[in-house]
Curated annotation (Swiss-Prot):
GO biological process terms on file: apoptotic process
Leader sequence residues: none
Family annotation (PROSITE patterns): GALECTIN
A GO CC annotation given for this chain: nucleoplasm
Species per Swiss-Prot/TrEMBL record: Homo sapiens
InterPro entries xref list: ConA-like_dom_sf, Galectin-like, Galectin_CRD
Protein name per Swiss-Prot or TrEMBL: Placental protein 13-like
């Protein structure tokens, strides 16, 4: 399967009930501290507010947050992450009525309460130290 470009940016609409599915593989061993970052922007550029950010250094806790007018809000951390060094992963972010439900390799890892209405999300960006094989938005 061919790789997608990284960073990968996509205009999106994420109504309640939709799901973002991201598959890829870290390109560095966990010892070298590779990262993965997923941002849900409220506009079509990187200066827009961030409704939801999922960021992790593989092998360390994930950090989830939002950013309003350039000011980061309270970060929430998730310590249980079923990523494996050098192995492909599937990250699914489900848009629910009150939160984003984050799953990795079929296991729920966190629920992040909405800080912006889901309908405000206009652009998705996936980047950092990964070989990206798929980004899919499902209803």
């Amino acid at each position: 399967m061919s790789s997608l470009p990284v960073p990968y940016t996509l205009p999106v609409s994420l109504p309640v009930g939709s799901c973002v599915i991201i598959t890829g593989t870290p390109i560095l061993t966990f010892v070298k501290d590779p990262q993965l970052e997923v941002n849900f922007y409220t506009g079509m550029d990187e200066d827009s507010d961030i409704a939801f950010q999922f960021r992790l250094h593989f092998g360390h806790p994930a950090i989830m947050n939002s950013c309003v007018f350039g000011i980061w809000r309270y970060e929430e951390k998730c310590y249980y992450l079923p990523f494996e060094d050098g192995k492909p992963f599937e990250l699914c972010i489900y848009v629910r009525h009150k939160e984003y439900k984050v799953m990795v390799n079929g296991q729920r890892i966190y629920n992040f309460a909405h800080r912006f209405p889901p309908a405000s999300v206009k652009m998705l960006q996936v980047f950092r130290d990964i070989s990206l094989t798929r980004v899919l938005i499902s209803d």
